[in-house]
Amino acid sequence: MAIRKYKPTSPGRRGASVSDFSEVTRSTPEKSLVRPLHGHGGRNAHGRITTRHKGGGHKRAYRVIDFRRNDKDGVNAKVAHIEYDPNRTANIALLHFLDGEKRYIIAPQGLSQGDVVESGPNADIKPGNNLPLRNIPAGTVIHAVELRPGGGAKLARSAGSSIQLLGKEGSYASLRMPSGEIRRVDVRCRATVGEVGNAEQANINWGKAGRMRWKGKRPSVRGVVMNPVDHPHGGGEGKTSGGRHPVSPWGKPEGRTRHPNKASNKLIVRRRRTGKKHGR
């Protein structure tokens, strides 16, 4: 993938860029793997906003992705197409299995149309193949990693992300996360070899607020420019600093987003670097 820059023909085009979609080989998705997707605008079943800054955006259809890949062991599949997916930053690959079934997977870096991939403990160590962690050698770069055996891929699924398998000891494997955190995961969990493709996506300059609205992202308004009724930082004559430590609209201090007593915390060998004091 490469980035194509626009000429400054208007203020919105100045500095803006877009993917050239050179890796994409088909524009229409596989009809049998598409499901309707209804936008909720960040509202729950009661109509109340539970996630701010969401709403609008272009209509999308959901592509069903196979995140488990545990029921096709030993069955080879050919990469029929690399496709764009509006629901994620990575591209997706359409696989045609020898038994006639079709499935989507996240497209890793280097996977191209016509390649053959497979799943199972005896699969080769090459991009796109899916194996249990116990069958992957130490030092291998992987993505789409499960947290629980059979639970489906949860880690390293976005464009350009990857995890390094540092080693295995007993029934656990040590993984270095994209954040720098080192975490232990059951060796029965599956992972896909290689890093996620479309890494240049992070370098796109969106150019104007309207392109964010097309993606369903609404403006994020600072609390200090609101009225006192709307935010703890609101009000004051002229510009103010807010007058207190940063808090959410509901008065909770910023940061501290992790649950302190989460059961899986005992599997963290080394925490990510945050620039903050841990245990605040």
From Swiss-Prot:
Pfam families cross-referenced by the UniProt entry: Ribosomal_L2, Ribosomal_L2_C
SMART domains with a match to the protein in the record: Ribosomal_L2, Ribosomal_L2_C
Region ranges (Disordered): 1-58, 226-280
Gene3D superfamilies, alphabetized: 2.30.30.30, Nucleic acid-binding proteins, Ribosomal protein L2, domain 3
Coiled coil: none
SUPFAM superfamilies: Nucleic acid-binding proteins, Translation proteins SH3-like domain
GO biological process, one term: cytoplasmic translation
Keyword Ribosomal protein: yes
Family per record: Belongs to the universal ribosomal protein uL2 family.
UniProt name for this protein: Large ribosomal subunit protein uL2
Taxonomy of the source species: Bacteria, Bacillati, Actinomycetota, Actinomycetes, Mycobacteriales
Name of the coding gene: rplB
